Amino acid sequence: MTKITRDKRNFKFETLQLHVGQEQADPTTDARAVPIYQTSSYVFRNCDHAAARFGLSDAGNIYGRLTNPTEDVFEKRIAALEGGVAALAVASGAAAVTYTILNLAQNGDNIVSAKNIYGGSFNLFEHTLPQYGIDTNFVDIFNEEQVESAINEKTKALYIETLGNPNSDVVDIESVAKIAHKHKIPLVVDNTFATPYLVRPIEYGADIVVHSATKFIGGHGTSIGGVIVDGGNFDWEASGKFDSLTKPNPSYHGISFTQACGAAAFVTKVRAILLRDTGATVSPFNAFLFLQGLETLSLRVERHSYNALKVVEYLNNHPQVESVSHPSVSTDPKQQELYKKYFPNGGGSIFTFDIKVDAQKAKDFIDNLELFSLLANVADVKSLVIHPATTTHSQCTEEELLDQGIRPNTIRLSIGCENIDDIIQDLDEAFKAIA
């Protein structure tokens, strides 16, 4: 009987999250765990070797701002889990989003974005990027006609989140991808809230996937980081809209990234140009912690999802709750359909609900929670809570808040991995305290 070699096996997600990037023990020390390479720089064998590294003709480490062996394992692992060809780890999720847009658009260009997105991304698109000549057309992502009409000859990307923040609206990735590709632009998907364990956007037509690794990937609220995953399927040359990728780049020896780097052209350019010039590098120690998080990602997400569905059911039947914004209890037939399509095993442990009180009482409810932590993060193993209108989305105007489904009595929950009875009891006590 012929033995199937390791590199030819079609390993499942749970196996990939443990092994990709370090299939064997460390060759120098025989350590099974991925070492932390806490170094700023690397020795070249000779001047020719150094020149080859800087010219990208020899793949390998140049300087700690650009590459690191610990980070390399993390990048390979997340790329495999998302089904991409390559990935780049950076210092934060915000850096991942910023680099992605700056790698696509320049002064005079625009992107089209769903309006129901993370408040930090909204502010980046609405206020910061316009200072550099990059505008954003915000749309109702569920209105295909509106999306189509927002795209023009200067549009360089369509941007969505798998699950809208903070209300967990499920976006039809496949449908939006078709619109993007019809106009020869890439679809960028922030998959932070879903994780590749629940949804792999590249399989539905996404071209670039970004994450805040701080959230589910790390999972324990200890580290800040982000990831950009290159799907490797977008034809940059056929598009004709991305000269910085296809034509000789004057800031890097005149190379064409599509010619030199093939399917991984996009993420290679981010590393070689943007990371080189602006330096939002993830630390080796944080990359190590993210690898630790990845090893239990599937287990944690299963528990998060189970607990979340129980909490949603509890809130949806509570007399003091006005509404729950979670696709599992949505009355919108389209949302029900999309939830079944993209989340057949459930999911969505970050969501909002509107309590039947005014803003002050909503804040009183939050202040009476004891198990939930009031902080500006999500997807921790511990349950978290926040008042979006006065925190994460406080920079938005009243109209922008309403557009994103955020009202003064809206509360966002991030359901953790505690015992479900304890989670519900904590919520119950807070409701009693404001009754």
Where are the regions a protein language model picked out?
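Conserved N-terminal alpha-helix of the aminotransferase class I/II PLP-enzyme fold
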Residues: 46-95, 120-128
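Short, acidic Gly/Pro/Ser/Thr-rich loop/turn segments
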Residues: 25, 43-47, 235-236, 297, ...
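Conserved PLP-enzyme active-site core in the AAT-like
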Residues: 2-9, 17, 21-25, 87-317
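Conserved C-terminal alpha-helix-loop-beta "cap" of PLP-dependent enzymes
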Residues: 301, 309, 316, 320-411, ...
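PLP-dependent enzyme catalytic core of the Aspartate aminotransferase-like
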Residues: 1-2, 14, 85, 126-127, ...
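Active-site beta-loop-alpha junctions enriched in small/polar residues
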Residues: 163, 192-194, 329, 356, ...
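Short amphipathic alpha-helical segments
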Residues: 59, 85, 286, 290, ...
